[in-house]
Amino acid sequence: MLRRLVMAAACLLLSVQLGAADEKTKGKLSIWLGYPETLDAFKLGQAEFKKKYPNVDVEILTFELREFEAKLAVSVPAGSGPDILALHDFIFPRYHEGGSLADMPADLAQVVNTKTIIDTPFRDIVTRDGKPWGLPWWSGRNGLFYNIDHLQAAGLSGPPKSYAEVWQYAEKLTQKNAAGEVTRAGISLRLTGPSGGTQKFGYFYYQLAGVQMFEPGKKPGTVQVTIAKNIDAAARVLLDHVEHLHGPKKSDDWALKHDAQGFASGAASMFMRESWVIPFVRKNGPDIKFGVVPVPREKSFGAFNAVEVLSVNKDSKLKDAAWDFIRILQDQAIVNNVLESSGWVPLRRDRDYSAVLSKEPRFAQMTSPPADQVQYIEAPNVAYEEMTTRVGEVIQAGFRDASLVGNLEGAKRVMMRAHDTAVKILKDNGNYSD
């Protein structure tokens, strides 16, 4: 009861801060989104915003993510672009280092700096020299998704609990035809799209190594490459992929439908992805009975987080109104909409998500992660796209090399190429950290 009273007080405080209607402020507030699935939340915010700013028009445009990033990269440095910058964590440094972000109001900075509201890992990615430059809004937190009917048919009583069990389950869940071709993947692996492939390979790597392949460096925006120091773990992850793509343990194939589409169609029994999969499968695979658990542990127990940050363009002519819109987006009804409609996990720890969880309890794995699970975030840096793409190309070429089956030394050589590729790119961009 006390928690709910505190949350109600916080929502009341938000309303007080917005104050009476402002009829003097006029103009157009522009918002661009690279995640169209959050549009409904912004429209809810727009309706509330108009009560405070009746003479400000709000324009919300949505784009495919890469198009969104490209448009921002051209417009913002030129002094234009949207008023509100909805920045993914890996592009946030580009706009901070480019001097494109407006100062945060003190009340929102206090929100970011209060651990009971925004957890420390998420505060840190937006903070430079003790000063936050954006509000972490939602996270894409990963988990292991599994088909309940497939597990039961294979005589498996529940989802895997360890890294080793993931691969053992994959072998038991795989179906093959008379010619030995995989017709249903035991686990759908990320085999294409090198940048995303690097990220998904990292889900496995973290549990074995206890660190990411690319950790934040000593200075914000710099990166340490950890592969060489954890070469045994890196090679083991590569070998496990290769041995489940070739030979008797084969549990996946490039010819199959992959990722969320494969899982929602029943073409895969397990896969690892972020929280948006829950509403996606509900919509696209309504007959699929599925569960989700944290990524199974090994040496370590961590969860990847992809974070969306809300900042204001320093060249905006409506900065105060833009920050008020961001305040409105913290409202309970709006963060509930983000979770329920898009599957992204709001980062406000002082909000009550029980209304959504009562309808979709699988979200609880994301909103209330285990106490001993480490929440980690990719090291944001301006060379992110190039680095993860080139490293992913090395790793995914390794996936196709059947000569690596049982070849630990060969796997180590591949992963050292990945290490050296990342180091060179980071040094060339001035982002490398020892």
Model-assigned labels for residue ranges:
Residues 89-141, 198-200, 206, 287-293, ...:
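Hinge/lid segment of periplasmic solute-binding proteins
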Residues 145-148, 305-317:
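A bilobed periplasmic-binding-protein/Venus flytrap-type ligand-binding module shared by bacterial periplasmic
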Residues 169-171, 217-252, 295:
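Glycine-centered hinge/linker elements that transmit conformational signals in sensory
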Residues 23-24, 57, 152, 374-434:
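Conserved C-terminal helix/tail region of periplasmic/extracytoplasmic solute-binding proteins
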Residues 120-125, 286, 290-293, 340-393, ...:
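Long, aromatic- and glycine/proline-rich binding clefts that accommodate carbohydrate-like moieties
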Residues 25-36, 56-61, 84, 133:
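Short, well-ordered beta-strand elements
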Residues 44, 48-118, 149-161, 261-262, ...:
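Extracytoplasmic "Venus flytrap"/periplasmic binding protein-like
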Residues 131-137, 142, 167-223, 268:
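Extracytoplasmic/periplasmic solute-binding protein
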